[in-house]
């Protein structure tokens, strides 16, 4: 095993968390400091570090609070335990873990060194990869789930159950461990230019495995899942255009179409937030560009921040696009103040395995939420 050479190690793809090990040398004025002392950084370097820290702080606050509320709501309220929402729970768990690493990364940007030791280095880098793969795998399964619900409603009665969704979520984490565990093993801390960096130590030849890793991540954590999602929604679009009533009930059809749109919006947000960093990594790896150009470095960190921002965006999308989550969020906010109506969220009647259209509602009227 040998560390990735400096020319190749400047950009590790753990949501590029360890890309900031090059941050002190990214600007010529900062790299001119022979001692590598963090105190002699340029004004532009300091300004970028402060901007990144402010952005990460906002993303961390919104992402942690929002995703914890989503998970708590799904666990607490029986009517939210639907197949679609079980997948959403998995997505929220991955997002919450990713946003929990941001305080450590903000400190790294400000201090120009990794002060937290090798154990946290392994945890942070592996969490980034887990988030990347579990998120896109979960979104892919959500799209397949919607395809089955829309195009094969009879089969959906057996396939789309909370129990099977939980089993699929476990399989997603096991599959993601095929990447996350090796990253945890390869993550190390190393001294560099008077500071400590948290980076990946690939086997020899390190440049080869570094390049292979980035290309495989681009293919299997972005291109292939997006192709599957595109096919699923293309088939759904044809079905929705050719059939006026999917379920024989206008009310159920409205719910089905509404939740299909919500999943599509969440997938679209993921693509918009993650496409820039995936493309940037491939360009950075395969094209000879000036990696010390301040504009290139600023664009890189903007792409990284955009990827993290997706983790805080999802709970906002659920709240705006899904009436059930909106009602449950309101109930959760009112509960500490004693504003919750007794029995309004938990109904004595037995829940069915299939998803329904009501959740967290004071009556048995249509809730129009995520349970279609």
Curated annotation (Swiss-Prot):
Disulfide linkage: 121-198
InterPro entries: Delta_opi_rcpt, GPCR_Rhodpsn, GPCR_Rhodpsn_7TM, Opioid_rcpt
Predominant subcellular localization, coarse grouping: membrane
Segments on the Cytoplasmic face: 76-85, 145-163, 239-261, 322-372
Location(s) in or outside the cell: Cell membrane
PANTHER family given in the database record: DELTA-TYPE OPIOID RECEPTOR, NEUROPEPTIDES RECEPTOR
Official protein name in the record: Delta-type opioid receptor
Organism per entry: Rattus norvegicus
């Amino acid at each position: 095993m040998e560390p990735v050479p400096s020319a190749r190690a400047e950009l590790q793809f753990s949501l590029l968390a360890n890309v900031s090990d090059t941050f002190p040398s990214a600007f010529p004025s900062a790299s001119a400091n022979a001692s590598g002392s963090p105190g002699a950084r340029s004004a532009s370097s300091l300004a970028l570090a402060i901007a990144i820290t402010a952005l990460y702080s906002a993303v961390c606050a919104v992402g942690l609070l929002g995703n914890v509320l989503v998970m708590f709501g799904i666990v607490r309220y029986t009517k939210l335990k639907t197949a679609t929402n079980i997948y959403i729970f998995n997505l929220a768990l991955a997002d919450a873990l990713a946003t929990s690493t941001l305080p450590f990364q903000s400190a790294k940007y400000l201090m120009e060194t990794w002060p937290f030791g090798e154990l946290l280095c392994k945890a942070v880098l592996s969490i980034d990869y887990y988030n990347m793969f579990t998120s896109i795998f979960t979104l892919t399964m959500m799209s397949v789930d919607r395809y089955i619900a829309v195009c094969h409603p009879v089969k959906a009665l057996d396939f789309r159950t909370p129990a099977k969704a939980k089993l699929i979520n476990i399989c997603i984490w096991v599959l993601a461990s095929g990447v996350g565990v090796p990253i945890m093993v390869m993550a190390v801390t190393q001294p560099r230019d008077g500071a400590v960096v948290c980076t990946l130590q690939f086997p020899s030849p390190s440049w080869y495995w570094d390049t292979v890793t980035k290309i495989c991540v681009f293919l299997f954590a972005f291109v292939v899942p997006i192709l599957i999602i595109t096919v699923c929604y293309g088939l759904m679009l044809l079905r929705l255009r050719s059939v006026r009533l999917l379920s024989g009930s206008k009310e159920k059809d409205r719910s089905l179409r509404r939740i299909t749109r919500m999943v599509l919006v969440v997938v679209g947000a993921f693509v918009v937030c993650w496409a820039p960093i995936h493309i940037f990594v491939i360009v950075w790896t395969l094209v000879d560009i000036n990696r010390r150009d301040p504009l290139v470095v600023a664009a890189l960190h903007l792409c990284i921040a955009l990827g993290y921002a997706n983790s805080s965006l999802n709970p906002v999308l659920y709240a705006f696009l899904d009436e059930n989550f909106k009602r449950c969020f309101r109930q959760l906010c009112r509960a500490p103040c004693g504003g919750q109506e007794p029995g309004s969220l938990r109904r004595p009647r037995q829940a069915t395995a299939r998803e329904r259209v009501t959740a967290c509602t004071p009556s048995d009227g249509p809730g129009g939420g995520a349970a279609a």
